[in-house]
């Protein structure tokens, strides 16, 4: 087991400083994934927010990888039922696009979402995904020390 993960944002959209060379072609993604497997890199970091990244991965059969995806950024000041419906929709779309029945992990993409009123609804939803074996691991993306 290797402790590295492949970030897949550029598999689905122009991403990064200057975004050169831009979105990676599907043939190049296939080569990257094959090389990753040959070197025992078995984890992929993706998100529905990464353009067509999840769809691209689904086209290439990522059953052998531990796939970690992320929630959307919630824009409301308080987490409400519409947010939970969107979370459910997004997660199921991720599974469809990835052509998987479950993923290894789900990260809350914005730690600030956990500080909002109603955040316990997000946590309950994600814990239910774990209970129903749709995910194995739960986590959060951290961008600032204050979130630790």
What are these regions (language model features)?
Residues 81-148:
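Glycine/proline-rich, positively charged
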Residues 54-72, 124-135:
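Alpha-helix-loop-beta-strand connector modules within alpha/beta enzyme cores
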Residues 9-11, 47-49, 70-74, 108-111, ...:
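Active-site beta-loop-alpha junctions enriched in small/polar residues
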């Amino acid at each position: 087991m290797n402790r590295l993960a492949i970030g897949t944002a550029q598999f689905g959209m122009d991403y990064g400083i200057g975004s050169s060379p831009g979105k990676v072609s599907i043939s190049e993604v296939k080569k990257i994934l094959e090389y990753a497997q040959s070197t025992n890199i078995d984890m992929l970091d993706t998100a529905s927010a990464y353009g067509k990244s999840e769809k691209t991965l689904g086209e290439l059969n990522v059953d052998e990888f531990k796939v970690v995806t992320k929630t959307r950024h919630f824009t409301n000041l308080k987490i409400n039922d519409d947010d939970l419906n969107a979370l459910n929709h997004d997660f199921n779309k991720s599974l469809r696009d990835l052509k998987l029945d479950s993923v290894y992990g789900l990260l809350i993409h914005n730690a600030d979402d956990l500080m909002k009123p109603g955040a316990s609804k997000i946590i309950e939803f994600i814990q239910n995904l774990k209970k129903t074996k749709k995910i194995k691991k739960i986590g959060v993306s951290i961008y600032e020390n204050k979130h630790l």
